[in-house]
Design a protein with these regions (language model features):
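An N-terminal RHG(E/S)-centered segment typical of histidine phosphatases
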Residues: 1-36, 51, 55-59, 78, ...
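Amphipathic, non-transmembrane alpha-helical scaffold segments
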Residues: 16, 20, 43, 107, ...
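Generic structural signal for well-ordered alpha-helical scaffold segments
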Residues: 24-28, 111, 115-123, 144
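Phosphate-coordination/substrate-recognition cap region in phosphate-metabolizing enzymes
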Residues: 24-90
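Alpha-helix capping/helix-boundary segments
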Residues: 45, 139-140
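Acidic, low-complexity terminal tails and accessory targeting/binding regions
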Residues: 59, 70-81, 123, 127-129, ...
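Short glycine/proline- and acidic residue-enriched helix-loop micro-motifs
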Residues: 88-109
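Generic beta-sheet signal
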Residues: 129-135
């Protein structure tokens, strides 16, 4: 989101000061880890998150288009309050498995794209290799749901915070999670009942 708009794949959406601080905190947290590679969505905000981690490890960020945000089609750049008034909003919240964004992709297509990308990365690196993928919260939720066998209609029950860490172990065609939505500091925007 940008302010109160659905950012999606909009170009020129950069991290704000808080986001840059979070990216620096991630780089510091990862500084002692033997990272072999770092991959990112091509969008500016993910590259700006990935670059401090890459610099810390003397690596180059490798751009993977399959890590891109969901293609929200005509919804991209639209005011969220206006979208919430649309007849499709409730449908998206309750039956996302059956929804395709107008002029965009479906959640099922986005999930398949992300799962295939992560599976491919798991196949080209050794079992104990550590790689970092920087992506988008909905795409991370979709991939967590995929690898845990959570029905697509329930993926929105998962919460992924900005600059959180999800650790996925892929080996011999099997997936296990070491962490989901691990935050380095408690998100300020969380209040009881959120």
């Amino acid at each position: 989101m940008v302010g109160k708009k659905l950012a999606g794949r909009l170009p020129d959406v950069h991290l704000n000061e808080a986001g840059r601080t979070q990216a620096g905190n991630l780089a510091a947290a990862f500084s002692g880890l033997p990272i072999k590679a770092i991959f990112s969505s091509p969008l500016e905000r993910t590259l700006e998150t990935a670059q401090p981690i890459a610099r810390e490890h003397d690596l180059t960020v490798e751009i993977l288009p399959d890590l891109l945000e969901i293609d929200f089609g005509n919804w991209q750049g639209q005011d969220l309050e206006e979208l919430k008034k649309s007849s499709d909003w409730k449908y998206v919240q309750e039956q996302p498995a059956d929804f395709r964004f107008p002029m965009g992709e479906s959640f099922a297509e986005a999930q398949q794209r992300m799962a295939a990308c992560l599976t491919h990365i798991g196949e080209i690196y050794q079992k104990d290799d550590l790689v970092v993928c920087v992506g988008h919260s909905d795409m991370i939720r979709l991939s967590v749901a995929h690898f845990l066998g959570i029905p697509l209609n329930d993926f929105q029950r998962l919460r992924i915070e900005t600059a959180s860490v999800t650790v996925l172990y892929l080996s011999d065609g099997k997936a296990n999670f070491g962490a989901i939505n691990h935050v380095l500091s408690f998100p300020e925007n969380l209040k009881p009942g959120d």
